[in-house]
Amino acid sequence: MEEPTVQFSDEDLVDNFPPMDDERVQLEDLEFEVERPSEGLEDEGSHSSAKKESKGAEKMRKSTTKDQVQAFHLRKSLNLLDKMHEEKDVFIQKTKGELHICRQRMDLLNKQQESLAAEIATEKEANNMAAIGRLQAASRRLQTELENEKDLQSKITAMLKDSENAMWHIEIQKGQFEDVRKHHEAEAEARQRGLEVHSARQLQREREAMEKSEKNRLLRARKSLHTQKELGLRHQKLVEDAQRNHRIAVKFLKASLGRVREREQKEEMESRTHMQRRMDAVLSLKNNITASRETLKKFQAWGQTRADLAKQKALTEKEVILSQGGDAFKYLFHQRRHQELEAQKRAFEEEQKLRKQEIVNRILKEEAEEEQRKRRQHPLSKPINRRTLRDKTWQYISDFCEGKSVLTSQQERERELLLYPKTVCVIKAISSESVQVDLGSISTEDEVLAEPDISGLWNKESYQVPKEDMERKPVGGSKMEKDILARTMEQLRSGVVQKQVVSGREFKGRPFNSKPEVIHFKDFDIGKVYKKKITLINATYTINYCKLVGVEENLKDFIHIDFEPPGPMSAGMSCEVLVTFKPMINKDLEGNVSFLAQTGSFSVPLKCSTKKCSLSLDKELIDFGTYVVGETTSRIITLTNVGGLGTKFKFLPDSEFYEMDESQPAMKISSLFTCEEKIIYEKIMTSLSEQQLEVNDSSLVDLQSLKESEKQLDDPEVTTAAVSAMTMIPSEEQAEITLGEVTEGEIGPFSSVKVPITFTPVIPGEVQTKFKVMFKNPQSPPLYFRATGTAIDVPVWVPKATVDLKICMYDRLYQDSITVHTRSKAALRLKFEVCKELRGHIELLPETGYIQAQSTYSVQLKFLPRQSLPEDARKYFDPASRVLEAPMTIRVADQIKPVRFTVQAIVTTSDLEINPSEINFGYCTIYEAIRTEICLSNLSLLPQEFGFVGLPKYVDIQPNDGFGTILPLETLHLDVIFQPIKAKEYKFELVCKSEINRCFKVSCQAVGVHPPLELSHYQIKFSATSLYDTSVSTLYVINSHLSMNKMIHSLPRIGSEEAAPVGPTSFEFLLPPNSPITISPSVGTVLPGKRCLIQVAFQPVLPKEIIYKEASQILNKEIETKPVSQKEIVQRKELWKQSFSVVRVHNRDRPTRVSTPQATELQRPVINSSSTEFQIAQATLSKAFQGKFNRFVIPCVVASGDIKDRKTAEPLSFSPHNTLYLELWCPAVAPFIVVTSHKGKTDFNFGDIAVGHRSVKKITLQNICNEDLTLEYSVLNPNGPFVRLNPFNKLRSGETQTLVLSFSPHENILAQETLDIITKRGTLSLTLFGMGVASMITCSIDGNILNMGYVLARESVSTNFKLQNESSLPIKFWVRLESLSRKKAEAHQQLPKFITSHEQRAEIVGTQNYNGQSVFSIVPVEGLMFPGKAQEFTVTFSPDHESLFFSDLLKVVLFEKKVSHQILLKGAAREHMMFVEGGDPLDVPVESLAVVTAFDTEHKEEAEELKPILVTLNYVQLDTDTTTSPATRELQVGCIRTTQPSPRRPDHPLMVSTLLQLRGDVKETYKVTFVAHVVTGL
């Protein structure tokens, strides 16, 4: 806040002021002022001599310079004073503000002190000592703050006073320099006026120079124009010659091309026909293959489904049986056995069928051979009792099925030759297909052949009783034996109730004792026969009898008793009974063998038990005792099987679950199919194979593979596993008591297996583990045992069993400390060992040491991984994961188990890889930058910081200027941007340093190019442009190369090559094909020091391919939805008839497939850019357009020279290195306003409209953007034919409005205009065009007057004329007569014409008929004239009385408004055929309204009066000396052609007589005869 006050003197202000920045400007002004007196001396021109003038000027220049220097220093002093005055003023204002704030704070503190004093008084009254202390402390703090504020106020006040004093001193000094200031201001104004005068003179000189240059330019332009005209004439001549030669060449070329096209079309048609046939064949083959594969897939899926269903059914049955408590394994075994037997039976039947077919085929073949052989022999007599082929076949089949010997074909032929010599059998040939079909339908069981009435009549051999039947006894014995048995049984029955009393004692109990007491067949096998003898001992007191009763019902199928009754048996005597057991099922059987004795019945128990497992362990507890941690011991446990059935076993811990695999017997997959299904399947497969053989050999592979799969499925060795073994769940912790190597296997009957149990203590303490033995046999329950042991700990241990060094880099040292503990009460010697492979990388220090009792010992671990670590420690190092696990050993004296720990580390490299290692930027201009991408890869597992250092100023690396952190195994993509500053060759290196100061280099090279031309802009960003709208931007191509002096500016060159010459330089922009960019001009020449304006236009459009695709879809929909017209149906019928007739002609010889695509599909119209579908598709796609952004880089090649100087075919030598690039950003968006009417078209054709008429079109516009738009319209030509009828200025979002436009041509012209609808989001251009057609009609009447001539009254005459339509529009016309117009009624209101008639007629409509009808009529009165056609009109003249003044006006009106032609119709009527005209008129030219009465035809000539003709001849002779011409008048005598019959003969001329009365001096009467011949009708 302190501002020191400094006093300045005048000398200090003048001398010690630092120099200002405007010294240069002041010196320039000084030079101007020095030159000004010399100019004034020149203007005065009144000096005596040049010497005096120069001396005075030199003296004045010296004095002026001194004054200017002094004034300059004074000006600097004044500026310094002004600056100091401003600073002091600001500082004073700031100090005053701080003083005001300080006073406000003091007032606030005073108020707070007063409030605190009041609160202290209040608390004192309340005797609140705590509050009083707190308030007093606050009061003291406020007092301190108030004192500080007072000190601050005094300081600020002193500072303010000093500042004001300094301010006053500065103002006093400024007052002293006030006169100097005013003087300098006056000088500045004078200097400014001088500058303005100088500027005006300079401007005048520049204008004169400009006018002179403009004249020179006009002169050069005239000369250039003259030269261009000469060149144009010469060029036109050359073009005409070239065109003439071209026409001659084209004539011959067309002829040659025509022949070539005909030949190519012929070849193309042949190739198309051939290709069509091949395509049809391929499609047919493909369809057949697809159908076959689908069928095979269905059958495979069918078989798989049935197999799954069968498996599911088996599992369900197993669960049901288990839930019911039954034996599921036995049930499934029997079921599978049954299925196996059924499958074998079906397989045997199928084999029999195949054998039958094979035999039949063989017999047929032999018969065919025999028939051929016998045909070559002479015919023999009729065979006697010859067996047919059918008999022999079935005889052979029956013999084969019964197992008899079958004769071979050769033996059969020999036998036939012996039995039937010289016999021939004519056998009808049977195809193999019919034989197969018959055999497929024959069943050996269902076929019933014809049999004779007497059995054995047809048999050739007598029946022989088989040996088995002879040896077989009848069931139940012979008749005699049955009688004996009946008597014996009767005796036995009668003696059952007999009591045996001997010596007074009655026998009670079992009469016979059996040895053994129980008949037990153990461990039997199905199919084998077991026999046992039992001895029956008479246990009664006297003689007894024994008779076999039998066995129980459930044992009769398996037990056979051989017992011959011994007769009476004394007491103690015995007899033997042979019991035979033949098991058929694997099932336990129990029952009794019953006997009958004289004293009663008794029985011997019978048991049949299957093979079973009887398993046991020799011990249930294994006690290992006490062992030290690390030692290993083992015990043996024995598993014994005393049963007759072996099984598989597995020892496992009690905590684990394991289910033994149950092997299922072989089951054929084919058993899943029934016989009927298999027959159907075989038939389908046979048909498929036949089709495939006809189509292609490739399908044989599929069928072969299918058959192989069937064989594999039918193979009995293929079995399905019922239950898969579950995997054992490993224990998370390592078990101390484990099983040995033998944990599972198979134990046979009556054998034993020994299994070792191992105890390896790891943790001190008591260990107990339970085990169980699982068996595959479900009837054998698991066995359990347990093992116990006690472990004691070692005295030395390491707390950290694993030393984790984390991630380490090669060639860097890492250290850690390892602590060893002991619980021993004595000192122990320790030795630290590192494995041999890692001794060059890991070191433990010290290697040997002593650890004291119950203490710790530290060892230092040093790890320095070398690059050879992966090769040295292959056993401990994983190259894939880069993990090192090195075991370390601590050997302790008197301790068996060494202490081990592991050193674990992830070893990684510190390399950074840069790809590519060499960069060649190529040629690069100084106006552009080349960007290339490099990949920086971190091969380490640790993140590393990197940075590119020491970069040249023309190289940049992005992002982040080439600095950053790269993550482990990450690859960063960096952009190296090279922009040369001048043209030369560049070679440099990019250095990348890591955080550990490792350097990685990339070598770079490039060539800098300075092009002769440059662009004003190298990048253009267009605004968002709607589809079919245009955005335009401008730039300049500048030629700044003016001199070859390299000291002035850098010369354009390529690298170190020679500089480009000074002169006109040409350029050309190379646009990519099909781009929406237009550059105008794209080619040009720029003179040195000049620039050329370039316009770049961007007009986004939709690709035509997409539009054509959308248009074709629209056309297809229209064709599908369009109903078929009757014409198309008739056309299709005709085409079908034609194609059918062609097929019928070809089918006379063989069937031929004829393709007639015209009959099935009509030819579709061709879509072009002017079609309706194309425009609809374009509008639809424009609405759905989502926007697109394109970036174009347009190259601009540069060449030295002028384009005009080059020859016609010689291109300029453009260098590829002197290429400029223009970057364009082109965003395209959907249009914001679209046309919804006229199918979205923006081109509106009003068509051909007649001149003077108007056509109106309504255009519907819709705003499809999300905001309201204000519309502006471009100005249409005010004198043009197009007019906007209802312009609207606003279109809301989604709103639709209608714009009405009209087209009214004023002349015959093709009109086209563009109406731009302008919004802030874009412009919609509507193209309007129409043709104004003038109604050009020509009339065949010359002069527009049609004179009908003379007609006899009450007759009519007609004549024709034509109107020709010369325009391109059909014209509607109306023909109107003036006498029939509406204006006639107005004419009736006026005075009659004969009253106001003049000497000459002035009316168009003359005399009319008396009967009210028009005297003139015309046909037709209206119609339509087509373009180029003529319309013929017939005009009829029908007068009803005599008059010479018939007239009317005929008007041809076009389009009800325009009068095209006016034809005056005239005619005259006479009562007689002959008439005379001429002379002076004797009546008025208009007839009276009175009607002259008509006379009869007979008396007409008598009643008529002769009408005189007044001919006045005026002869005036003014001078008698001269002869004058006589007075003449002309009279016309006419004859009218009539259709009335004439009474005179035609060979006599018609005589006309008249009387001439001459009035004057001579009165004579002459008779004059006029002869008139009718030459033409008038």
From Swiss-Prot:
Residues making up the signal peptide according to the UniProt record: none
GO biological process, one term: axoneme assembly
Coiled-coil region(s): 103-156, 330-378
GO cellular component terms listed in the entry, alphabetical order: axoneme; sperm flagellum
Subcellular location: Cytoplasm, Cytoskeleton, Cilium axoneme; Cytoplasm, Cytoskeleton, Flagellum axoneme
InterPro entries to which the protein is assigned, alphabetical: Ig-CFAP74_2nd, Ig-CFAP74_3rd, Ig-CFAP74_4th, Ig-like_fold
Record bears the keyword Coiled coil: yes
Matches recorded under Pfam families: Ig-CFAP74_2, Ig-CFAP74_3rd, Ig-CFAP74_4th, Ig_CFAP74_1st
Stretches for region Disordered: 1-21, 33-67
Keyword terms of this UniProt record: Cell projection, Cilium, Coiled coil, Cytoplasm, Cytoskeleton, Flagellum
Similarity comment: family membership: Belongs to the CFAP74 family.
Protein name, per record: Cilia- and flagella-associated protein 74
